[in-house]
Protein backbone atom coordinates (compact mmCIF):
# COMPACT_ATOMS: atom_id res chain seq x y z
CA UNK A 1 0.00 0.00 0.00
CA UNK A 2 1.35 3.44 -0.91
CA UNK A 3 0.76 5.44 2.28
CA UNK A 4 1.65 8.76 0.62
CA UNK A 5 -1.64 8.48 -1.27
CA UNK A 6 -3.41 9.07 2.06
CA UNK A 7 -1.49 12.22 3.02
CA UNK A 8 -3.05 15.55 2.04
CA UNK A 9 -0.69 18.41 1.14
CA UNK A 10 -1.82 21.83 2.34
CA UNK A 11 0.34 24.67 1.02
CA UNK A 12 1.08 27.76 3.12
CA UNK A 13 -0.14 26.25 6.41
CA UNK A 14 0.41 27.22 9.20
CA UNK A 15 2.35 30.00 7.46
CA UNK A 16 3.36 31.00 3.94
CA UNK A 17 6.05 28.81 2.45
CA UNK A 18 5.25 25.73 4.56
CA UNK A 19 3.79 22.59 2.97
CA UNK A 20 1.72 20.94 5.71
CA UNK A 21 1.45 17.15 5.49
CA UNK A 22 -2.01 16.32 6.81
CA UNK A 23 -2.35 12.81 8.25
CA UNK A 24 -6.13 12.97 8.81
CA UNK A 25 -7.06 11.23 5.52
CA UNK A 26 -4.76 8.35 6.50
CA UNK A 27 -6.08 7.93 10.04
CA UNK A 28 -9.71 8.06 8.91
CA UNK A 29 -9.10 5.20 6.46
CA UNK A 30 -9.10 1.97 8.51
CA UNK A 31 -7.00 -0.04 6.05
CA UNK A 32 -4.35 2.66 5.60
CA UNK A 33 -4.18 3.41 9.33
CA UNK A 34 -3.84 -0.27 10.22
CA UNK A 35 -1.18 -0.76 7.54
CA UNK A 36 0.80 2.24 8.81
CA UNK A 37 0.65 1.08 12.45
CA UNK A 38 1.52 -2.52 11.49
CA UNK A 39 4.48 -1.32 9.40
CA UNK A 40 5.90 0.78 12.24
CA UNK A 41 5.19 -1.97 14.81
CA UNK A 42 7.07 -4.53 12.73
CA UNK A 43 10.17 -2.30 12.71
CA UNK A 44 9.87 -1.46 16.42
CA UNK A 45 9.70 -5.18 17.17
CA UNK A 46 13.45 -5.31 16.49
CA UNK A 47 14.15 -3.20 19.60
CA UNK A 48 14.08 -4.07 23.29
CA UNK A 49 12.14 -1.36 25.13
CA UNK A 50 9.67 -0.80 27.95
CA UNK A 51 7.79 2.40 27.17
CA UNK A 52 6.61 4.64 24.37
CA UNK A 53 6.93 8.39 24.93
CA UNK A 54 4.88 10.71 22.71
CA UNK A 55 3.93 14.39 22.53
CA UNK A 56 0.43 15.77 22.22
CA UNK A 57 -1.62 15.87 20.16
CA UNK A 58 -1.02 13.99 16.93
CA UNK A 59 1.73 11.92 18.52
CA UNK A 60 -0.97 10.33 20.68
CA UNK A 61 -2.80 9.17 17.54
CA UNK A 62 0.19 7.14 16.36
CA UNK A 63 1.61 6.08 19.74
CA UNK A 64 -1.53 4.70 21.42
CA UNK A 65 -2.24 1.93 18.89
CA UNK A 66 1.48 1.07 18.81
CA UNK A 67 1.60 0.76 22.61
CA UNK A 68 -1.47 -1.47 22.52
CA UNK A 69 -0.18 -3.65 19.67
CA UNK A 70 3.32 -4.02 21.17
CA UNK A 71 2.10 -4.41 24.79
CA UNK A 72 4.11 -1.41 26.02
CA UNK A 73 3.34 1.39 28.44
CA UNK A 74 2.55 4.85 27.10
CA UNK A 75 3.92 8.10 28.54
CA UNK A 76 2.07 11.19 27.30
CA UNK A 77 4.12 14.38 27.12
CA UNK A 78 2.09 17.58 27.19
CA UNK A 79 2.14 21.34 27.06
CA UNK A 80 2.51 23.31 30.32
CA UNK A 81 -0.39 23.05 32.77
CA UNK A 82 -1.97 19.94 31.24
CA UNK A 83 -0.58 17.20 33.53
CA UNK A 84 -1.98 16.87 37.08
CA UNK A 85 1.14 15.64 38.90
CA UNK A 86 4.65 17.07 39.40
CA UNK A 87 6.48 17.40 36.10
CA UNK A 88 9.88 17.84 34.54
CA UNK A 89 10.11 20.03 31.45
CA UNK A 90 12.17 21.01 28.44
CA UNK A 91 12.05 24.26 26.45
CA UNK A 92 13.06 24.01 22.80
CA UNK A 93 13.11 26.02 19.58
CA UNK A 94 10.48 25.69 16.88
CA UNK A 95 10.50 27.08 13.36
CA UNK A 96 8.43 30.02 14.61
CA UNK A 97 9.30 30.45 18.30
CA UNK A 98 9.77 28.38 21.43
CA UNK A 99 7.77 25.53 22.90
CA UNK A 100 7.76 23.67 26.18
CA UNK A 101 7.02 20.03 26.94
CA UNK A 102 6.18 18.49 30.32
CA UNK A 103 6.24 14.90 31.56
CA UNK A 104 5.32 13.48 34.97
CA UNK A 105 8.50 13.25 37.02
CA UNK A 106 7.82 9.58 37.88
CA UNK A 107 6.82 8.50 34.35
CA UNK A 108 10.13 6.81 33.60
CA UNK A 109 12.30 4.83 35.97
CA UNK A 110 16.11 4.90 35.81
CA UNK A 111 17.48 2.76 32.97
CA UNK A 112 14.06 2.08 31.44
CA UNK A 113 14.34 1.73 27.68
CA UNK A 114 12.13 4.08 25.71
CA UNK A 115 11.02 4.66 22.12
CA UNK A 116 9.95 8.14 21.00
CA UNK A 117 6.88 8.27 18.73
CA UNK A 118 5.38 11.25 16.89
CA UNK A 119 3.39 11.84 13.73
CA UNK A 120 5.94 13.88 11.75
CA UNK A 121 9.71 14.25 12.02
CA UNK A 122 10.43 17.73 10.65
CA UNK A 123 13.44 19.60 12.06
CA UNK A 124 14.05 17.15 14.92
CA UNK A 125 13.46 19.77 17.62
CA UNK A 126 10.52 18.04 19.29
CA UNK A 127 12.20 14.64 19.14
CA UNK A 128 15.34 16.02 20.79
CA UNK A 129 13.25 17.72 23.50
CA UNK A 130 11.56 14.35 24.17
CA UNK A 131 14.96 12.65 24.30
CA UNK A 132 16.23 15.21 26.84
CA UNK A 133 13.11 14.67 29.00
CA UNK A 134 13.61 10.89 28.95
CA UNK A 135 17.27 11.30 29.89
CA UNK A 136 16.42 13.79 32.70
CA UNK A 137 14.22 11.06 34.16
CA UNK A 138 17.05 8.52 33.86
CA UNK A 139 15.64 6.63 30.88
CA UNK A 140 17.44 5.47 27.75
CA UNK A 141 16.06 6.25 24.29
CA UNK A 142 16.73 3.27 22.02
CA UNK A 143 14.83 4.31 18.87
CA UNK A 144 12.33 6.73 17.40
CA UNK A 145 9.43 6.28 14.99
CA UNK A 146 7.30 8.67 13.00
CA UNK A 147 4.58 8.27 10.42
CA UNK A 148 6.30 10.86 8.18
CA UNK A 149 9.88 12.10 7.88
CA UNK A 150 10.52 15.39 6.08
CA UNK A 151 13.98 14.51 4.78
CA UNK A 152 14.39 17.89 3.05
CA UNK A 153 14.59 19.52 6.52
CA UNK A 154 17.55 17.25 7.38
CA UNK A 155 16.32 16.07 10.80
CA UNK A 156 18.98 13.34 10.91
CA UNK A 157 21.58 16.10 11.30
CA UNK A 158 19.92 16.90 14.65
CA UNK A 159 18.94 13.39 15.73
CA UNK A 160 22.29 11.65 15.67
CA UNK A 161 23.02 8.12 16.90
CA UNK A 162 19.32 7.29 17.21
CA UNK A 163 17.52 4.86 14.90
CA UNK A 164 14.67 6.52 13.00
CA UNK A 165 11.71 4.60 11.58
CA UNK A 166 9.42 6.43 9.15
CA UNK A 167 7.36 4.61 6.50
CA UNK A 168 6.56 7.85 4.63
CA UNK A 169 9.36 10.15 3.49
CA UNK A 170 9.27 13.45 1.64
Curated annotation (Swiss-Prot):
It is found in: Cytoplasm. Disulfide bonds: none annotated. It catalyses: AMP + diphosphate = 5-phospho-alpha-D-ribose 1-diphosphate + adenine. InterPro entries: Ade_phspho_trans (IPR005764), PRibTrfase_dom (IPR000836), PRTase-like (IPR029057), UPRTase/APRTase (IPR050054). Pathway: Purine metabolism; AMP biosynthesis via salvage pathway; AMP from adenine: step 1/1. It is an enzyme of class 2 (transferase). The keyword Cytoplasm applies. Keywords: Cytoplasm, Glycosyltransferase, Purine salvage, Transferase. Its EC number is 2.4.2.7. CDD domains: PRTases_typeI. GO terms for molecular function: adenine binding; adenine phosphoribosyltransferase activity; AMP binding. It comes from the Bacteria. One of its GO terms (biological process) is AMP salvage. The keyword Transferase applies. One of its GO terms (cellular component) is cytoplasm. Catalyzes a salvage reaction resulting in the formation of AMP, that is energically less costly than de novo synthesis. NCBIfam families: apt, PRK02304.1-2, PRK02304.1-3, PRK02304.1-5. Belongs to the purine/pyrimidine phosphoribosyltransferase family. Homodimer. This is Adenine phosphoribosyltransferase. It comes from Fervidobacterium nodosum (strain ATCC 35602 / DSM 5306 / Rt17-B1). The lineage of its organism: Bacteria, Thermotogati, Thermotogota, Thermotogae, Thermotogales. The gene is apt.
